[in-house]
Structures are given as structure tokens and as C-alpha cells.
Amino acid sequence: MFADSAKIFIRSGKGGDGHVSFRREIFVPAGGPDGGDGGKGGNVIFEVDEGLNTLGDFRLKRKYSAGDGENGQKKRCSGKDGEDLIIKVPEGTIIKETETGKVITDMSHENRREVILRGGRGGKGNQHYATPTMQVPKYAQPGQKAMELNVTLELKVIADVGLVGFPNVGKSTLLSRVTNAKPKIANYHFTTLNPNLGVVDLDGADGFVIADIPGLIEGASEGIGLGHEFLKHIERTRVIIHLVDAASTEGRDPVEDIEKINHELSSYNEGLLLKPQVIAANKTDVLYGEEEEEAINKIKEAFESKGIKVFPISAVSGQGVKELLYYVSDLLKTVDATPIVFEKEYFPEENLVMSEPYTVEYNETEEVYVVEGPRIERMLGYTNIDTEKGFEFFQKFLKENGILDQLEELGIGEGDTVRMYGLEFDYYK
């Protein structure tokens, strides 16, 4: 079954905890701390797989987790890093944060592989915390927590030309005639429930990729029927071909059909109407003489004044199809060929960390002030507080984020101890 959207849960690996231990060997009475570091958690990586053309696999499995880092061990042994998780998707897949709908990344064109969630940093063992004044550190740094995210995957086909029209106007028939695609063809509304792609080869001219966008109905832009599922596939195309039933075999007016579809395109995304359009007036094989001329002229009068070319064709007999294809090939040369790639709007590492608050509490049992939270943990992970510059940055961070104010509100005094993820400091103004 073709599937062009799916919602899944992803989780990176947690960092392993640093270890607290001391060297215990004969003839070495005071060997000092030798706790090893925790391993790094695995990343969640998305990768394009050329062999995939659907998101159907994600209907069977909804939760994906990378490996956790192992904890550190004694004798300075570091824990093993967690295994990365590689999730393979078809080219053209857009990854969005589910709650906001913002784009995390677009897996198309040059973007073939991207880390979406990074694994947690491994905690430092107590071997790192020995100082001249603290030779027996009995604490180690815990591993950084895993990152979790609900994401929506959307597959938007990549084609030069989008073929649009109401059900039963002959899109599948035309596609099967001009390409090697083998779409199912039947006279039922919504027979085509997935975009069919085909390559048009032309003698002496540039070929192109064409996508048969499944039949649209009024209200598609509001999600009626399978509207949103279909309309999104038009966003990557560079030229739109309107296929209409010029013979009105089902009683519809072809001019009204085009206007209705353009209304749906505009309601979904106004930018779609900026794409060049061509009209293929189909089923002329069932019209004769003045009847055909009258039907075609009616369409031309409505649209050629707007710069939209009209081609009378028959998808069944092939009449007029070659002229249509060569015109579209020439038209594509005038259209910007820059790949349509959706820009990033959501940055998991930044958004997830900044959205979670920190806590400042007093532990009466240990008589220590404890500061925790992803922002604190991340800051400590990339700041070397053993250097003068790093320590100045650390102090500035505490002040700008209101942590010092909260400590004072809790009644901290000179010389009191503050703990942050295995690190302890004495408080002085």
C-alpha cells in the first residue's frame, strides 16, 4: 500500500553515567580515584534510500530508539558508546515536529543523510575531579539524558510537471501513453489514490518527470476527501498541466473545473498559482466538427488571454499529445530549475533544551543546593570551567538565567555548597 505520511516517536540514546571508584591494589594504599567515563548515547539519523518510494513501513512500527551509552567502570574504563539508529526514508520526505508542524529537515536533492537527534553526552568519572584540596572525590557526572521527539513524515513527490484535474478526466490514461508508468485505470472517483510518476522521453528535446496528482474534488484545500494528501505533492513541481474533459462527458463545465481547481490550489498555498500552467483539453475524440471547435474556443477565450496555452488532445488516440509535450519541454527551460527544498524551521537540539526549565532546590539531608535542567547540563557539557575564560562564562550564564537570584531567594549564604550534575562549588559573592 502506498503511504505518503506517518507519525512516529524517536529517541536518541542516553549518555552513560560516570563511575565512582578508587584504585585498590596491593602496595598502593592510596591509589586515588579511577572511575571511568560513561559512553555517548547513539544518534538518530535519517537517510535517503533510493529503493524506497513509500512510507508504508512506518505504519507497522511507530517507536524508534537509538542505543544508550554504557556506564563507566573502575580502572578508568570508559563505557561503550550507544549504537546510532539509522532510519531510511524515500527521497522527498519532509520531517516535521508534530505539535507545531514546523519543518525539521527536507530529505531531498543534496540532503541524503542528517542527524536529527544527538545522543546524550557520557558523564565524567570521578578520576576527573581530584584536586589538591579534594583528593577523594566521591561523585561523578551523570550521563546526559536522551532527547525525545514526536515527528511527522510527509512524502512529497519530486517531479518537473504536475498533472491535475478532477476524477475521470483521463490523467492515468495520458500518463500511461506518454511514459512507461503503469497506473491503474478505471472510471471511478478516487481510483488513483497515490501519485504516479513517469519519465517523458522526447526526440530532439529535453525530457521531464511528470506526476499524476490523484483526482481532486471541491474542498480539497480544507482536507475534504484526501485533499491535503494530494495537494502537497504539487508543491515541488515546476509546471502544472490542467487536464479537463472538453467533451463534458460527465456533465461538468471544463472552464469551471479549471477555476475550481485553481481555487483549491490557491487556498492550500497561494504560491502554487505562480507556477506556469498549461491546459490539456482532453476527450476531443468524442467531439465532431463545430461541436469540437466550439468547446475548445470556449476554453481558449477563458484562459489564453491570461497567458495559459490550451491544447486540444485525446489521451486515448494520442491526437495533439506530442505538441503538448514539446511545448511543456520548452516551457520548463524558462522556469527556475533550482530544486524546491523546504527550509528548516525547527531545531530539535535547541528547541528541546530551551523549552525545558531548570530547577533550583535545597536538599536538607545533604545540606546542599541542587541546580538541574537540560540547559544547565548542556552548558556544562561544552564549557571547560577549569579555565579562566570558561569559569567567567559559567558565572555569566548563572547570572543571566536568574539562577543566582533563585539561590539567594532560597537563602544561600557565603560558603554554602551548590551541586550541578556531579560538580560541587562553594558559593561566594
Swiss-Prot record:
UniProt-recorded name of the protein: GTPase Obg
Names of required cofactors: Mg(2+)
Location of the protein in the cell: Cytoplasm
GO MF, any single term: magnesium ion binding
Record domain OCT: where: 350-429
Any GO CC annotation of this UniProt entry: cytoplasm
CDD domains found in the cross-reference section: Obg (cd01898)
Primary enzyme class: hydrolase
Domain OBG-type G: start-end pairs: 159-333
Keyword Metal-binding: yes
Obg domain location: 1-158
Subunit structure: Monomer.
Chain positions recorded as GTP binding sites: 165-172, 190-194, 212-215, 282-285, 314-316
Membrane-spanning intervals of the chain: none
Keywords for the protein's UniProt record, in alphabetical order: Cytoplasm, GTP-binding, Hydrolase, Magnesium, Metal-binding, Nucleotide-binding
Protein family membership: Belongs to the TRAFAC class OBG-HflX-like GTPase superfamily. OBG GTPase family.
One GO BP: ribosome biogenesis
Pfam families: DUF1967 (PF09269), GTP1_OBG (PF01018), MMR_HSR1 (PF01926)
Residues given in the record as Mg(2+) binding sites: 172, 192
SUPFAM superfamilies (alphabetical): Obg GTP-binding protein C-terminal domain, Obg GTP-binding protein N-terminal domain, P-loop containing nucleoside triphosphate hydrolases
E.C. number: 3.6.5.-
Entries under InterPro entries matching the protein: G_OBG, GTP-bd, GTP-bd_Obg/CgtA, GTP-bd_prot_GTP1/OBG_C_sf, GTP1-OBG_CS, GTP1_OBG_dom, GTP1_OBG_dom_sf, OBG_GTPase
Purpose: An essential GTPase which binds GTP, GDP and possibly (p)ppGpp with moderate affinity, with high nucleotide exchange rates and a fairly low GTP hydrolysis rate. Plays a role in control of the cell cycle, stress response, ribosome biogenesis and in those bacteria that undergo differentiation, in morphogenesis control.
